C-alpha cells in the first residue's frame, strides 16, 4: 500500500513541499530565512489576532485600548511587545532574504523574484499601517507625512490623499480603514507566500555556487527541517531577548504620547526598517522627485535580472562584485543611520551622497564590474 502522505490529496501537497522535496546538498544558512519569514508571519498573525480582540479602532479610545492591553489584559504586555518587535524580526529576515537573493543571483527565477518584490511592498504597507494603530504622536504624524507624499502625484494627488484619509486630515475614518487593511493584508501576504513557494518549487532552489544542482539533490526532510528548526530557535531566542529585556529599544518615545494634531514632534521619523528609504526620500529637495526615488529604491529590485551582465549566476567566484555588494550593504546602513538624524549639516550631504551611491552601485557599477569580470576570464 502506498504511503498516505504520498496518496492523500492534502498530505501530498505538504509532502512535496516540505518532506520529499529534492533540495541542493550545499545550501547554506542563508537559505534559512524563507522558513523564518513563514514563522514570523504566523507569529504576527497570531499575536495580532489576540491584540485585535482588545483593541478599538477609534481616535478617542485607540491609545487607551493599547494601554489597557499592556496593563489589564492577561499577558497583554508580552503579546503587544512580541507583535511590535516581531515586525522588526520580520524585516531583519526580509533584508537578509533579499540580500541572499542579490548575492547568489536568485533573481534569475523571474516569477519567484517578482512575487517576492510584490510581497516586500505588501509587508511594508502592512507594517506602516500597523504603526499608525496605537495612535501615539509618531503614529499620527507618520501617517500624515507618508500619506501626504501621494499629493505629489500630478493632477490627481490631492484628491487621492483626501480619498485615502476619508476626510481633510488623518482622523477617525483613516484609523478605522487602516485597522481594516492591517487585519486583512497579512492573509493576502500568506496567500502570496504560497504562490511564491509554488513558483520556487517549479524550478527548485538555487545554491551558493549558482550552478545547476540536479545531479546532487537530498530530501528536504530530515536535513533541512532540522536546520530550519535550529534557525527558528535562534530567531525566537533573539526575539524573546528583545521582548523581555528591552522591548522599547527599537520604538520611538514619542509614541507614548497620545496623538495631538496641534503639536508636531521635532523629528518625525518612521520605524528603523524604513529609515533607508526615508533618507533617500529626504535627500531630494523636490517633492515628486523624492517620492519617485523612494518608490524606485525598492522597485529597482524588479530590474535586477535585466541588470545581470555576468556569465556566472552567483557572486561566489566574483571577488570584485562581492566588494561592491558589501559596499552596497554599508551604504544601506549609512542611509538607515541618516534617516534617523535631523535635517541639518552634515547629515544632509551625507544622505545625498549615500543615495547617489545606492543607485550608482546597482544601476552602473555592478553591471560594469560583471562585464569586466567576464573579460578577465576571457568569456
Swiss-Prot record:
Membrane-topology descriptor: Multi-pass membrane protein
Which is a Gene Ontology cellular component entry for this protein?
Answer: mitochondrial inner membrane
Q: What is its main location?
A: mitochondrion
What is the superkingdom listed in this entry's lineage?
Eukaryota
Cofactor (UniProt) = heme b
Q: Where does heme b b562 bind?
A: 83, 182
Q: According to the record, how does the cofactor bind?
A: Binds 2 heme b groups non-covalently.
Q: How does it assemble?
A: The cytochrome bc1 complex contains 11 subunits: 3 respiratory subunits (MT-CYB, CYC1 and UQCRFS1), 2 core proteins (UQCRC1 and UQCRC2) and 6 low-molecular weight proteins (UQCRH/QCR6, UQCRB/QCR7, UQCRQ/QCR8, UQCR10/QCR9, UQCR11/QCR10 and a cleavage product of UQCRFS1). This cytochrome bc1 complex then forms a dimer.
Family in the record: Belongs to the cytochrome b family.
Task performed by this protein: Component of the ubiquinol-cytochrome c reductase complex (complex III or cytochrome b-c1 complex) that is part of the mitochondrial respiratory chain. The b-c1 complex mediates electron transfer from ubiquinol to cytochrome c. Contributes to the generation of a proton gradient across the mitochondrial membrane that is then used for ATP synthesis.
* Name assigned to this protein: Cytochrome b
Q: What is the lineage of its organism?
A: Eukaryota, Metazoa, Chordata, Craniata, Vertebrata
Amino acid at each position: 500500500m502506498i504511503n498516505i502522505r504520498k496518496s492523500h490529496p492534502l498530505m501530498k501537497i505538504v509532502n512535496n513541499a516540505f518532506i520529499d522535496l529534492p533540495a541542493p546538498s550545499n545550501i547554506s544558512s542563508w537559505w534559512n530565512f524563507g522558513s523564518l519569514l513563514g514563522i514570523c508571519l504566523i507569529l504576527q498573525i497570531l499575536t495580532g489576532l489576540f491584540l485585535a480582540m482588545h483593541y478599538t479602532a477609534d481616535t478617542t479610545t485607540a491609545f487607551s485600548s493599547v494601554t489597557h492591553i499592556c496593563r489589564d489584559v492577561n499577558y497583554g504586555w508580552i503579546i503587544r511587545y512580541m507583535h511590535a518587535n516581531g515586525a522588526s524580526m520580520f524585516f531583519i529576515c526580509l533584508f537578509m532574504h533579499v540580500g541572499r537573493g542579490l548575492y547568489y543571483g536568485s533573481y534569475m527565477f523571474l516569477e519567484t523574484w517578482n512575487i517576492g518584490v510584490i510581497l516586500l511592498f505588501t509587508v511594508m504597507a502592512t507594517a506602516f499601517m500597523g504603526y499608525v494603530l496605537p495612535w501615539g504622536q509618531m503614529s499620527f504624524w507618520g501617517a500624515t507625512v507618508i500619506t501626504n507624499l501621494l499629493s505629489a502625484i500630478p493632477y490627481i494627488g490631492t484628491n487621492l490623499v483626501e480619498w485615502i484619509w476619508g476626510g481633510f486630515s488623518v482622523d477617525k475614518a483613516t484609523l478605522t480603514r487602516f485597522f481594516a487593511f492591517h487585519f486583512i493584508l497579512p492573509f493576502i501576504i500568506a496567500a502570496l507566500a504560497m504562490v511564491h513557494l509554488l513558483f520556487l518549487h517549479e524550478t527548485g532552489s538555487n545554491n551558493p555556487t549558482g550552478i545547476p544542482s540536479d545531479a546532487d539533490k537530498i530530501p528536504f526532510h530530515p536535513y533541512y527541517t532540522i536546520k530550519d528548526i535550529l534557525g527558528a530557535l535562534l530567531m525566537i531566542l533573539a526575539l524573546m531577548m528583545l521582548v523581555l529585556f528591552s522591548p522599547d529599544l527599537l520604538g520611538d518615545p514619542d509614541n507614548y504620547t497620545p496623538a495631538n494634531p496641534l503639536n508636531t514632534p521635532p523629528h518625525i521619523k518612521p520605524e528603523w526598517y524604513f529609515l533607508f528609504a526615508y533618507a533617500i526620500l529626504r535627500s531630494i529637495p523636490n517633492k515628486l522627485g523624492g517620492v519617485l526615488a523612494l518608490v524606485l529604491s525598492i522597485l529597482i529590485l524588479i530590474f535586477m535580472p535585466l541588470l545581470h551582465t555576468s556569465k556566472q549566476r552567483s557572486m561566489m567566484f566574483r571577488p570584485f562584485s562581492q566588494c561592491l555588494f558589501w559596499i552596497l550593504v554599508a551604504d544601506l546602513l549609512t542611509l538607515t543611520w541618516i534617516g534617523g538624524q535631523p535635517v541639518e549639516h552634515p547629515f544632509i550631504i551625507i544622505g545625498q551622497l549615500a543615495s547617489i551611491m545606492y543607485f550608482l552601485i546597482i544601476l552602473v557599477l555592478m553591471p560594469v564590474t560583471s562585464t569586466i569580470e567576464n573579460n578577465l576570464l576571457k568569456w
